[in-house]
């Protein structure tokens, strides 16, 4: 969830990957003062760590600025899939001609294909996401469809990943892969 330490853990993993060109792909669209403060806080926390920031709230597969410098290797931190998914679902006309359930499937495929393009380019790739909808609350139809879409994307990304780590109150809990 929000404030769980996911970002700090992802950054730590990128830094541990060694001396490589470091990219941070930021997907958050800033709305209001709270959003601006969150972005500023994250920028401050990344300061001095050598990240090149690319703002890409949608269509992350079109990110073409990933250049390998130095030793010819690069790492990428993508933050955050939950924002990316919301931006693609609510701020894009992709699949608008499809009925809602089919659009959700098409969006999940698109988002995962876009992320796979980054994975192919990177020597080390960390993806930050959220799990939403497990609180048992009742939601509007559109929100339920977003929760379903994010769940599909997260499941597919977990299948693609060599490691899956849940960060709970700053504590990494290995779900898939080698021990942390």
Residue ranges and their predicted role:
Residues 10, 42, 77, 130, ...:
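Residue-level signal for inorganic ion chemistry
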Residues 1-68:
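Conserved P-loop
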Residues 21, 73-75, 124-126:
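Residue-level preference for the first positions of well-ordered beta-strands
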Residues 3, 29, 82, 132-136, ...:
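Short, glycine/serine-rich, charged loops/turns that create anion-binding
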Residues 49-106:
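Helix-adjacent hinge/juxtasegments
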Residues 19, 46-48, 71, 120-122, ...:
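Short, well-ordered coil/turn elements that cap or connect secondary structure elements
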């Amino acid at each position: 969830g929000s404030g769980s330490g996911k970002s700090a853990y992802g950054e730590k993993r990128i830094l541990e990957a060694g001396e490589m060109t470091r990219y941070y792909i930021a997907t958050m669209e800033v709305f209001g003062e709270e959003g601006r403060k969150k972005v500023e806080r994250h920028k401050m926390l990344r300061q001095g760590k050598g990240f090149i920031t690319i703002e890409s709230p949608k269509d992350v597969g079109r990110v073409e600025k990933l250049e390998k410098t130095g030793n010819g290797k690069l790492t990428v931190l993508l933050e955050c899939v939950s924002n990316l998914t919301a931006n693609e679902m609510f701020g894009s006309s992709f699949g608008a001609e499809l009925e809602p359930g089919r659009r959700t499937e098409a969006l999940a495929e698109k988002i995962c294909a876009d992320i796979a393009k980054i994975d192919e380019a990177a020597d080390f790739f960390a993806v930050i996401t959220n799990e939403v909808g497990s609180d048992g609350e009742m939601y509007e139809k559109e929100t339920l469809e977003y929760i379903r879409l994010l769940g599909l994307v997260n499941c597919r990304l977990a299948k693609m990943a060599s490691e899956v780590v849940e960060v709970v109150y700053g504590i990494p809990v290995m779900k898939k892969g080698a021990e942390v």
